[in-house]
Amino acid sequence: MFAFFRRPLFKRARLFLLCAGLFSKCRLKPLFNPLETHCAMKPHTLTLCLLLTAAAVYLCCGIGFGAWESPLAMDETVRQIRLPRIYTALLVGAGLSASGAALQALFENPLADPSLIGTSGGAALGVIVLLALGGGTIGVPTAAFFGALGVCLLILAVHKLLGGGTLGLLVLGFVLSAFSGAVVSMILFLSDDLVLRSATTWLSGSLAEAGFSSPVAAIAVMLPGFLILLSAGRRLDVLMTGEDTASSMGVSVGALRVQTVIGAALMTGAAVSLSGIIGFLGMMIPNVLAQTVGGSRRKLIALSAWLGAVFLMVVDGAARWLTYPVDLPVGIVIALLGGPFFMYLFIKPLKSR
Protein backbone atom coordinates (compact mmCIF):
# COMPACT_ATOMS: atom_id res chain seq x y z
CA MET A 1 0.00 0.00 0.00
CA PHE A 2 2.96 2.34 0.61
CA ALA A 3 4.02 2.10 -3.03
CA PHE A 4 1.72 5.09 -3.48
CA PHE A 5 4.27 7.30 -1.75
CA ARG A 6 6.95 6.51 -4.32
CA ARG A 7 4.97 8.29 -7.01
CA PRO A 8 5.77 11.87 -8.04
CA LEU A 9 4.48 14.80 -6.04
CA PHE A 10 1.68 15.66 -8.47
CA LYS A 11 0.22 12.18 -8.02
CA ARG A 12 0.49 12.38 -4.26
CA ALA A 13 -1.47 15.61 -4.45
CA ARG A 14 -4.56 13.47 -5.08
CA LEU A 15 -4.54 12.77 -1.37
CA PHE A 16 -5.20 16.42 -0.63
CA LEU A 17 -8.10 16.45 -3.07
CA LEU A 18 -9.57 13.39 -1.40
CA CYS A 19 -9.23 14.95 2.03
CA ALA A 20 -10.79 18.17 0.79
CA GLY A 21 -13.84 16.19 -0.30
CA LEU A 22 -14.65 15.63 3.36
CA PHE A 23 -15.69 19.27 3.54
CA SER A 24 -17.90 19.26 0.45
CA LYS A 25 -21.04 19.15 2.59
CA CYS A 26 -20.05 22.21 4.53
CA ARG A 27 -20.31 25.66 3.00
CA LEU A 28 -17.54 27.80 4.43
CA LYS A 29 -19.31 31.06 3.59
CA PRO A 30 -21.06 31.28 7.00
CA LEU A 31 -17.65 31.65 8.61
CA PHE A 32 -17.58 35.12 7.06
CA ASN A 33 -21.27 36.02 6.79
CA PRO A 34 -23.41 33.79 9.02
CA LEU A 35 -26.59 35.68 8.10
CA GLU A 36 -26.59 34.54 4.47
CA THR A 37 -26.54 30.77 4.81
CA HIS A 38 -25.83 27.99 7.24
CA CYS A 39 -23.38 25.16 7.68
CA ALA A 40 -24.75 21.73 6.84
CA MET A 41 -22.35 20.07 9.27
CA LYS A 42 -22.74 20.08 13.01
CA PRO A 43 -19.70 21.35 14.93
CA HIS A 44 -18.80 17.86 16.19
CA THR A 45 -18.96 16.42 12.67
CA LEU A 46 -16.95 19.26 11.19
CA THR A 47 -14.28 18.93 13.85
CA LEU A 48 -14.13 15.17 13.32
CA CYS A 49 -13.56 15.75 9.60
CA LEU A 50 -10.80 18.22 10.44
CA LEU A 51 -9.25 15.67 12.77
CA LEU A 52 -9.31 12.85 10.21
CA THR A 53 -8.01 15.10 7.44
CA ALA A 54 -5.17 16.46 9.54
CA ALA A 55 -4.20 12.97 10.69
CA ALA A 56 -4.22 11.65 7.11
CA VAL A 57 -2.05 14.49 5.85
CA TYR A 58 0.27 14.19 8.86
CA LEU A 59 0.70 10.45 8.26
CA CYS A 60 1.02 10.50 4.50
CA CYS A 61 3.20 13.53 3.85
CA GLY A 62 6.90 13.36 4.52
CA ILE A 63 9.14 16.11 5.78
CA GLY A 64 10.51 16.50 2.30
CA PHE A 65 8.92 15.91 -1.09
CA GLY A 66 11.33 13.28 -2.39
CA ALA A 67 10.36 9.71 -3.18
CA TRP A 68 10.48 7.14 -0.43
CA GLU A 69 13.32 4.64 -0.54
CA SER A 70 11.26 1.58 0.32
CA PRO A 71 7.77 0.68 1.51
CA LEU A 72 9.25 -1.11 4.53
CA ALA A 73 11.07 2.04 5.59
CA MET A 74 7.85 4.00 5.21
CA ASP A 75 6.02 1.41 7.31
CA GLU A 76 8.57 1.75 10.10
CA THR A 77 8.42 5.55 9.91
CA VAL A 78 4.65 5.54 10.27
CA ARG A 79 4.50 3.01 13.09
CA GLN A 80 7.51 4.10 15.12
CA ILE A 81 7.54 7.88 14.65
CA ARG A 82 4.39 9.41 13.18
CA LEU A 83 1.63 7.40 14.87
CA PRO A 84 3.06 7.88 18.40
CA ARG A 85 3.49 11.58 17.69
CA ILE A 86 -0.07 11.86 16.39
CA TYR A 87 -1.79 10.27 19.38
CA THR A 88 0.47 12.20 21.75
CA ALA A 89 -0.57 15.47 20.07
CA LEU A 90 -4.23 14.46 20.16
CA LEU A 91 -4.18 13.56 23.85
CA VAL A 92 -2.21 16.62 24.91
CA GLY A 93 -4.27 19.04 22.82
CA ALA A 94 -7.55 17.60 24.08
CA GLY A 95 -6.45 17.53 27.71
CA LEU A 96 -5.12 21.07 27.92
CA SER A 97 -7.95 22.65 25.92
CA ALA A 98 -10.77 20.92 27.81
CA SER A 99 -9.24 21.72 31.19
CA GLY A 100 -8.75 25.32 30.09
CA ALA A 101 -12.43 25.62 29.17
CA ALA A 102 -13.44 24.31 32.59
CA LEU A 103 -11.00 26.50 34.52
CA GLN A 104 -12.19 29.62 32.71
CA ALA A 105 -15.72 28.91 33.89
CA LEU A 106 -14.59 28.06 37.41
CA PHE A 107 -12.58 31.27 37.85
CA GLU A 108 -14.97 33.27 35.64
CA ASN A 109 -11.92 34.49 33.78
CA PRO A 110 -11.13 34.01 30.07
CA LEU A 111 -7.40 34.22 30.82
CA ALA A 112 -7.38 31.08 32.97
CA ASP A 113 -5.05 28.49 31.49
CA PRO A 114 -3.35 25.41 32.99
CA SER A 115 0.07 26.94 32.37
CA LEU A 116 -0.73 30.55 33.30
CA ILE A 117 -2.25 29.71 36.68
CA GLY A 118 0.50 27.25 37.55
CA THR A 119 -1.34 23.94 37.13
CA SER A 120 1.02 22.67 34.44
CA GLY A 121 4.01 23.69 36.54
CA GLY A 122 2.63 21.75 39.49
CA ALA A 123 2.13 18.69 37.30
CA ALA A 124 5.70 18.92 36.00
CA LEU A 125 6.98 19.29 39.56
CA GLY A 126 5.12 16.15 40.60
CA VAL A 127 6.70 14.19 37.74
CA ILE A 128 10.25 15.38 38.46
CA VAL A 129 9.93 14.70 42.19
CA LEU A 130 8.68 11.17 41.50
CA LEU A 131 11.56 10.42 39.14
CA ALA A 132 14.09 11.96 41.52
CA LEU A 133 12.85 9.67 44.28
CA GLY A 134 13.38 6.66 42.04
CA GLY A 135 9.75 6.06 41.12
CA GLY A 136 8.86 4.19 37.96
CA THR A 137 7.40 5.79 34.87
CA ILE A 138 4.12 3.91 35.32
CA GLY A 139 3.25 6.26 38.18
CA VAL A 140 4.07 9.43 36.27
CA PRO A 141 0.46 10.39 35.33
CA THR A 142 -0.61 9.92 38.95
CA ALA A 143 2.25 12.08 40.23
CA ALA A 144 1.41 14.73 37.64
CA PHE A 145 -2.23 14.64 38.75
CA PHE A 146 -1.39 15.20 42.42
CA GLY A 147 1.00 18.00 41.53
CA ALA A 148 -1.63 19.74 39.41
CA LEU A 149 -4.33 19.08 42.02
CA GLY A 150 -2.28 20.64 44.81
CA VAL A 151 -1.65 23.81 42.82
CA CYS A 152 -5.30 24.04 41.73
CA LEU A 153 -6.60 23.74 45.29
CA LEU A 154 -4.10 26.32 46.53
CA ILE A 155 -5.03 28.77 43.78
CA LEU A 156 -8.73 28.24 44.42
CA ALA A 157 -8.35 28.93 48.14
CA VAL A 158 -6.16 32.02 47.76
CA HIS A 159 -8.20 33.38 44.85
CA LYS A 160 -11.38 33.16 46.90
CA LEU A 161 -9.64 34.72 49.92
CA LEU A 162 -8.47 37.68 47.84
CA GLY A 163 -11.93 38.19 46.37
CA GLY A 164 -11.13 37.22 42.78
CA GLY A 165 -9.94 39.50 40.05
CA THR A 166 -7.94 38.96 36.88
CA LEU A 167 -4.75 40.60 38.08
CA GLY A 168 -4.69 38.66 41.34
CA LEU A 169 -5.19 35.36 39.53
CA LEU A 170 -2.38 36.07 37.07
CA VAL A 171 0.04 37.20 39.78
CA LEU A 172 -0.73 34.15 41.87
CA GLY A 173 -0.28 31.87 38.88
CA PHE A 174 3.00 33.55 37.99
CA VAL A 175 4.33 33.11 41.54
CA LEU A 176 3.38 29.44 41.70
CA SER A 177 4.76 28.76 38.22
CA ALA A 178 8.04 30.46 39.12
CA PHE A 179 8.29 28.51 42.37
CA SER A 180 7.55 25.19 40.66
CA GLY A 181 10.04 25.98 37.91
CA ALA A 182 12.73 26.87 40.45
CA VAL A 183 12.28 23.59 42.33
CA VAL A 184 12.33 21.61 39.08
CA SER A 185 15.49 23.40 37.92
CA MET A 186 17.21 22.73 41.23
CA ILE A 187 16.37 19.02 41.09
CA LEU A 188 17.60 18.75 37.51
CA PHE A 189 20.80 20.66 38.29
CA LEU A 190 21.67 18.45 41.25
CA SER A 191 20.75 15.22 39.52
CA ASP A 192 23.19 12.94 37.74
CA ASP A 193 20.42 10.75 36.40
CA LEU A 194 20.35 10.69 32.59
CA VAL A 195 16.57 10.34 32.62
CA LEU A 196 16.17 13.50 34.65
CA ARG A 197 18.63 15.43 32.50
CA SER A 198 16.64 14.48 29.41
CA ALA A 199 13.69 16.29 30.99
CA THR A 200 15.02 19.61 29.70
CA THR A 201 13.65 18.93 26.21
CA TRP A 202 10.48 17.46 27.67
CA LEU A 203 9.79 20.57 29.76
CA SER A 204 9.94 22.77 26.65
CA GLY A 205 6.81 21.07 25.30
CA SER A 206 8.18 18.54 22.84
CA LEU A 207 6.18 15.79 21.15
CA ALA A 208 9.28 14.07 19.79
CA GLU A 209 8.95 11.46 22.52
CA ALA A 210 5.95 10.49 24.59
CA GLY A 211 7.41 12.13 27.68
CA PHE A 212 7.83 9.98 30.77
CA SER A 213 4.41 8.37 30.47
CA SER A 214 2.81 5.76 28.27
CA PRO A 215 -0.27 6.79 26.25
CA VAL A 216 -2.31 3.99 27.84
CA ALA A 217 -1.54 5.27 31.35
CA ALA A 218 -2.29 8.83 30.25
CA ILE A 219 -5.65 7.82 28.76
CA ALA A 220 -6.53 5.95 31.96
CA VAL A 221 -6.05 9.20 33.89
CA MET A 222 -7.43 11.60 31.27
CA LEU A 223 -10.71 9.85 30.43
CA PRO A 224 -12.18 10.03 33.97
CA GLY A 225 -11.16 13.69 34.11
CA PHE A 226 -12.95 14.43 30.84
CA LEU A 227 -16.13 12.72 32.04
CA ILE A 228 -15.96 14.63 35.33
CA LEU A 229 -15.71 17.96 33.48
CA LEU A 230 -18.58 17.08 31.16
CA SER A 231 -20.80 16.17 34.10
CA ALA A 232 -20.03 19.55 35.69
CA GLY A 233 -20.73 21.53 32.51
CA ARG A 234 -24.35 22.53 33.13
CA ARG A 235 -23.68 23.56 36.73
CA LEU A 236 -20.70 25.63 35.58
CA ASP A 237 -23.11 27.58 33.37
CA VAL A 238 -25.17 28.35 36.46
CA LEU A 239 -22.07 29.23 38.48
CA MET A 240 -21.06 31.83 35.89
CA THR A 241 -24.24 33.77 36.71
CA GLY A 242 -22.95 34.27 40.26
CA GLU A 243 -22.43 32.24 43.42
CA ASP A 244 -25.59 33.51 45.10
CA THR A 245 -27.70 32.68 42.06
CA ALA A 246 -26.14 29.24 41.76
CA SER A 247 -26.75 28.51 45.45
CA SER A 248 -30.37 29.64 45.20
CA MET A 249 -30.84 27.24 42.27
CA GLY A 250 -29.64 24.30 44.33
CA VAL A 251 -26.04 24.10 43.09
CA SER A 252 -23.49 23.12 45.72
CA VAL A 253 -20.79 25.61 44.80
CA GLY A 254 -18.11 24.06 47.00
CA ALA A 255 -18.64 20.55 45.64
CA LEU A 256 -18.73 21.89 42.08
CA ARG A 257 -15.40 23.65 42.54
CA VAL A 258 -13.73 20.55 43.94
CA GLN A 259 -15.17 18.43 41.13
CA THR A 260 -13.96 20.84 38.45
CA VAL A 261 -10.51 21.13 40.00
CA ILE A 262 -10.14 17.33 40.16
CA GLY A 263 -11.27 16.91 36.55
CA ALA A 264 -8.97 19.66 35.29
CA ALA A 265 -6.05 18.31 37.32
CA LEU A 266 -6.55 14.81 35.90
CA MET A 267 -6.51 16.07 32.32
CA THR A 268 -3.68 18.54 32.83
CA GLY A 269 -1.54 16.03 34.69
CA ALA A 270 -1.94 13.39 31.99
CA ALA A 271 -1.16 15.91 29.25
CA VAL A 272 1.93 17.29 30.99
CA SER A 273 3.24 13.78 31.66
CA LEU A 274 3.25 13.21 27.88
CA SER A 275 4.54 16.50 26.51
CA GLY A 276 5.82 18.71 29.26
CA ILE A 277 4.53 22.25 29.64
CA ILE A 278 2.71 23.75 26.65
CA GLY A 279 1.42 27.19 27.49
CA PHE A 280 -1.51 29.24 26.15
CA LEU A 281 -3.24 26.31 24.37
CA GLY A 282 -5.85 25.93 27.09
CA MET A 283 -6.55 29.66 26.89
CA MET A 284 -6.72 30.12 23.11
CA ILE A 285 -8.97 27.26 22.02
CA PRO A 286 -11.90 27.83 24.46
CA ASN A 287 -11.89 31.58 23.76
CA VAL A 288 -11.96 31.09 19.99
CA LEU A 289 -14.85 28.64 20.30
CA ALA A 290 -16.74 30.84 22.76
CA GLN A 291 -16.58 33.78 20.34
CA THR A 292 -17.44 31.79 17.20
CA VAL A 293 -19.62 28.84 18.24
CA GLY A 294 -20.85 29.71 21.72
CA GLY A 295 -23.23 27.38 23.49
CA SER A 296 -23.23 25.78 26.91
CA ARG A 297 -20.08 25.11 28.90
CA ARG A 298 -20.59 21.36 28.48
CA LYS A 299 -20.60 21.80 24.71
CA LEU A 300 -17.62 24.14 24.91
CA ILE A 301 -15.58 21.62 26.91
CA ALA A 302 -16.29 18.86 24.39
CA LEU A 303 -15.55 21.05 21.36
CA SER A 304 -12.40 22.42 23.00
CA ALA A 305 -11.10 18.88 23.36
CA TRP A 306 -11.79 18.15 19.68
CA LEU A 307 -10.39 21.39 18.29
CA GLY A 308 -7.44 21.43 20.67
CA ALA A 309 -6.41 17.98 19.48
CA VAL A 310 -6.63 19.03 15.82
CA PHE A 311 -4.89 22.36 16.38
CA LEU A 312 -1.92 20.94 18.25
CA MET A 313 -1.40 18.20 15.67
CA VAL A 314 -1.52 20.69 12.79
CA VAL A 315 0.84 23.16 14.50
CA ASP A 316 3.30 20.39 15.34
CA GLY A 317 3.30 19.13 11.75
CA ALA A 318 3.73 22.65 10.37
CA ALA A 319 6.57 23.39 12.79
CA ARG A 320 8.40 20.21 11.81
CA TRP A 321 8.03 21.01 8.12
CA LEU A 322 9.04 24.67 8.38
CA THR A 323 12.08 24.12 10.61
CA TYR A 324 13.36 20.88 9.06
CA PRO A 325 15.86 19.35 9.83
CA VAL A 326 15.54 20.91 13.31
CA ASP A 327 12.74 19.42 15.41
CA LEU A 328 11.39 22.56 17.08
CA PRO A 329 9.35 21.77 20.23
CA VAL A 330 5.72 22.59 19.60
CA GLY A 331 5.51 24.31 22.99
CA ILE A 332 7.72 27.10 21.66
CA VAL A 333 5.49 27.61 18.61
CA ILE A 334 2.31 27.65 20.70
CA ALA A 335 3.89 30.23 23.02
CA LEU A 336 4.74 32.46 20.04
CA LEU A 337 1.11 32.26 18.90
CA GLY A 338 -0.42 32.52 22.35
CA GLY A 339 1.53 35.54 23.58
CA PRO A 340 -0.15 38.07 21.26
CA PHE A 341 -3.52 36.38 21.83
CA PHE A 342 -3.08 36.73 25.59
CA MET A 343 -2.26 40.43 25.22
CA TYR A 344 -5.37 40.90 23.11
CA LEU A 345 -7.61 39.29 25.74
CA PHE A 346 -5.93 41.25 28.52
CA ILE A 347 -6.13 44.66 26.82
CA LYS A 348 -9.61 44.27 25.30
CA PRO A 349 -11.57 44.87 28.56
CA LEU A 350 -9.35 47.86 29.39
CA LYS A 351 -10.11 49.55 26.07
CA SER A 352 -13.86 49.13 26.57
CA ARG A 353 -13.83 51.10 29.83
Predicted ranges, named:
Residues F4-L15, C26, T37:
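Positively charged N-terminal leader segments that act as targeting/secretion signals
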Residues R27-L31:
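Compositionally biased, low-complexity peptide segments typical
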Residues F32-A40:
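Short, Lys/Arg-enriched N-terminal segments with co-localized hydrophobic residues
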Residues A40-R353:
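Alpha-helical transmembrane segments in inner-membrane proteins
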